[in-house]
Amino acid sequence: PAKYTTLYALYAEELWHDFPDEAQEALEAARKSLDYDLGKGEVSMDNMQWRAWASLILYRISGRDQDLALATESVNRMLDMQVTEYVGGQETTRGFWRSAAGATEYHHKHIGEAYPIWVLAEFVETLPEHADNQRWKDAIALWVDEYALVFADRNPFGLLPYAFYQT
């Protein structure tokens, strides 16, 4: 899965300057993992968040146009799964994610609920001049304002989703 591609890419990026041989091995592992992931063709929300992040890291390392193209394609496919309309007859919350494009199920994680937000924040920071940068910022704001804060306000303890504290 793309999660492993992300991990290998993060290792490569972290090791790049101080341990170039190990970084190169991690980079090769990330590329092999990415090839495997793309071959499987999985396009779920879970997979898209990891593929987008992995491809962005690979772009930061390599500067390759094809890495950037895959990163932006993946993050924008991820955004297509964000619920931007109110559903179920309510007008209180939105900004969360579907499990896949066109799915009725929600993307839910007990730990890692905010991973899509982390990914979007990486894109905003890495590509400040990109044409989609404002779209990424708007998706973050929608999740924060109309999902995370709504549920924190309704919780008697003022609790936020787990990963919100990590951002």
Locate predicted features:
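Glycan-recognition and catalytic cores of secretory/periplasmic carbohydrate-active enzymes
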Residues: P1-T167
